[in-house]
């Protein structure tokens, strides 16, 4: 084997070892992102909601910074309620549709229905509120008490 091939192989192995420490995103978070984009009709990238305020994209604590952040707080509370019913919201994937008439859940199991309803309500809520760029990536330790 040529030395150049060995270097490439070594680089790939090292990068894979480093990537093993990065936890994968829950699948339903990806679904929720698509649901947000459907609800807001691509007005704002869904990733902009991942680190917004005190509750969007984090476990959440403190007082929400605005109504948009309250949407995420409500979703977190909905997820907590789903957990009380034996569901695992961050691991639960569900069936839904994005059509001309809007969003629609068409899941089968109790947990899928519950989690989809949480995400559906949150996506619709986010679509109704104004996005304030000043609340993106805030210092949550100082601001969210």
UniProtKB/Swiss-Prot annotation:
Disulfide cysteine pairs (residue numbers): 38-98, 54-144, 56-72, 71-125, 78-118, 87-111, 105-116
Pfam families, alphabetized: Phospholip_A2_1 (PF00068)
Any GO BP annotation: arachidonate secretion
GO molecular function: calcium ion binding; calcium-dependent phospholipase A2 activity; phospholipid binding
UniProt keyword Chloroplast, yes or no: no
SUPFAM superfamilies (alphabetical): Phospholipase A2, PLA2
Record protein name field: Neutral phospholipase A2 paradoxin-like beta chain
């Amino acid at each position: 084997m040529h030395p150049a091939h060995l270097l490439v192989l070594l680089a790939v192995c090292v990068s894979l070892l480093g990537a093993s420490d990065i936890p994968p995103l829950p699948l339903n978070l990806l679904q929720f992102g698509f649901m947000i984009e459907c609800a807001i009709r691509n007005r704002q990238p869904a990733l902009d909601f991942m680190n917004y305020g005190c509750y969007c994209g984090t476990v959440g604590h403190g007082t929400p910074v605005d109504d948009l952040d309250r949407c995420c707080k409500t979703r977190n509370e909905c997820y907590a309620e789903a957990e009380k019913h034996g569901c695992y919201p961050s691991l639960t994937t569900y069936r839904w549709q994005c059509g001309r008439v809007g969003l629609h859940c068409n899941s089968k199991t109790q947990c899928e229905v519950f989690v989809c309803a949480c995400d559906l309500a949150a996506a619709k809520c986010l679509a109704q509120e104004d996005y304030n760029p000043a609340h993106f990536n805030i210092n949550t330790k100082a601001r969210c008490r």
